[in-house]
């Protein structure tokens, strides 16, 4: 079994190594008191019958002053265990986002893209994001997009509405989009997108 949606935010080794790691966990996710060694994380995967985990960072530095793990941290974790598969995250509204994505895939070995319009404070139908989608399509990697409700403070529910992705889904027909969390509470809208477009998949993570 593969856990397709894992945010590596409570790794003790990173809390010890990176000064802002604890602050990030508290500021973005309102957590940060139960850090655990990487070995414990792997043991928990064993207990749950999970063979591999997809690690998803979120580059929300512009909107939140922090990133939910960096691309380099995810690549480091993947180097520590073959049971991890890392995705990259870039902020579509930042200059050089498309080039950064290409670097993450070609140089860091990351295998996909994670976007979170709610935490990153952008609309997924913003044409400024087109260059990022275009590079992802050219690289042949999937993009996981947070859809549905976000519990994080100071986030707009509208940003998680899956229908905001329809223009991009139609325009970039060779790019596979994974709608995270089944877009709850917009489950029917997400279902309709997945039925209409062959490049749309649904992630059932809570």
Language-model segment annotations:
Residues 108-112, 123-206:
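Catalytic pocket-lining loop regions of alpha/beta-barrel enzymes
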Residues 5, 45, 74, 86, ...:
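Conserved, mostly hydrophobic/aromatic
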Residues 1-58, 65, 72:
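An N-terminally biased module of ancient metal coordination in phosphate/nucleic-acid-related enzymes
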Residues 23-36, 57, 85-94, 116-123:
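Active-site mouth loops of central-metabolism enzymes
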Residues 67-71, 95-99, 122-132:
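Active-site-adjacent beta->alpha loops and helix N-cap segments on the catalytic face
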Residues 35-45, 69-71, 93-105, 187:
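Short, acidic/polar
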Residues 8-12, 60-63, 92-96, 120, ...:
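Active-site environment of divalent metal-dependent phosphoester hydrolases
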Residues 38-42, 71-75, 101-102, 129, ...:
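Generic structural signal for well-ordered alpha-helices
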């Amino acid at each position: 079994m593969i856990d397709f949606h894992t945010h590596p935010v409570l790794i003790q080794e990173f809390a010890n190594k990176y000064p802002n790691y604890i602050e990030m966990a508290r500021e973005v996710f309102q957590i940060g008191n139960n850090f655990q060694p990487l070995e414990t994380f792997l043991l928990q995967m064993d207990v749950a019958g999970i063979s591999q985990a997809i690690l998803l960072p979120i580059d929300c530095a512009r909107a939140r002053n922090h990133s939910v793990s960096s691309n380099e941290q995810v690549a480091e974790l993947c180097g520590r265990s073959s049971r991890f598969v890392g995705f990259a995250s870039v902020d579509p509204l930042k200059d050089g986002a498309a080039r950064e994505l290409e670097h993450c895939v070609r140089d860091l070995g990351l295998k996909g893209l994670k976007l979170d319009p709610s935490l990153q404070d952008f609309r997924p139908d913003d044409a400024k994001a087109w260059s990022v989608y275009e590079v992802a399509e050219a690289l042949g990697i999937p993009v996981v997009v947070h859809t549905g409700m976000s519990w994080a403070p100071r986030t707009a529910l509208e940003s998680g509405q899956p229908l905001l992705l329809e223009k991009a889904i139609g325009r970039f027909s060779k790019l596979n989009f994974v709608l995270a969390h089944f877009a709850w509470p917009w489950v029917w809208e997400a279902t309709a997108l997945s039925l209409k477009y062959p490049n749309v998949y649904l992630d059932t993570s809570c």
